[in-house]
Amino acid sequence: MAQTKDFSSILKTDPLPILIEKAPVPTRFRVLKYFYPEDKKTLGELQKQRKNNKRRTQLFKSQRNDGSWELDDDYTIDKKRIAMSFLKQLQNLTELLYLGETAKPETIKQALIRLIKYQKEDGKFPLNHHHQGYALWLLAQYGLAGNPIVEKGYRWLIKRQKKDGGWISPVMKMSEDMSDGLTSCLWTTIIITQAFSAHSRLKNSENTRKAAQFISDRYLYKNHTSLFPEPDAWDYLYTDHTVNGMFRGGTLRFCEALAPLNYMHENKNFKKAIDWLKEQQLDNGLFPAKAGSDSKGDYQVTFRVLKLLDQIQ
C-alpha cells in the first residue's frame, strides 16, 4: 500500500489529483489501485470502463489458443521467427500491463505460460541480455518472480555477470572504440538491475549490489554500445510497448531500478537523479515523456514518478 498520498511538500504541484481526474481510464485505474485500494466503488466503476477498452478487446480477440499472437510478417528461418514471436509476446504483455491487467484472467495466464516456454532448458530467453532482463522484470510485475522456471532465467544471468558488475551481450555492437578495455553495457545493466531489484530475495544479493554500484557510478555516462548510445538517452523518461520503448526510461528507469534497494537511497548519484527528476515537473503538474522537449506531459510517466517517490519515502 502507498505510504504517501500527498506530494505537495516534495513537488511544486501535487499531480495525484490530476491523474485521478484527467488520466485515461487504464492509467486512472492503476493510480487508484495503487494509492487508494480501499475505494472499491470507484475502482469497480473504472474496472467496467477499462474492460471495454478497444485496444484491450482487440488484443484478447487476436490472441491464439496457445497464448501467443500472430506475427505481422512471415519468417522462413525458425530462429528468426521464434525471436520475433518472443518479442511480440513481450510487447503485448507490456501493453496489457499498462492497460491494467494482472495474472488473474485465463487469457493472461496463457500468455505468460507461452512467454515462459520461450526459455531454453538452461534458462535463456531468445535475443540479447537486455531482452532476458526485461522478460524477467515483466514476469515479476505479473507476480511470477518466484516461479522455479523463471528462477532459471535469473540464474542464467547471474552466471554471465561480468567482473565490473554489469552485463553485455556477446553480439552487441560497439558505438565507439573500446580497445582500452571493454566494460559492460550501461542500459543492458540498468534493465537487468531492475529485474533483480524486483525480486524479493535477489535484490539483497551480492550480484544485485555489484550491478547497482556499476550503474550508480555511471549515471549520465554515454553508453558505448548500440543500445541507446545518444547522449540524451537519459532524458527519455517514457516507456511503452514498442520494440525500443520497452527499454527506454532514462533517468526515471535508473531510479526505478535502484529504488527497491534501500542500501542505495543515500547514494549521491541516486539522490542527484531524484532531485533532477523533481525539477522536470511541468507547469501543468505532469512530468514529460522526454525532458526538455515535451510541454504537455505524460500521464504514465507522472504515475511512475509518484510511485518512485512513494517508494523512497
State where each predicted segment sits:
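Preference for long, amphipathic alpha-helical scaffolds in soluble/luminal domains
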Residues: 1-313
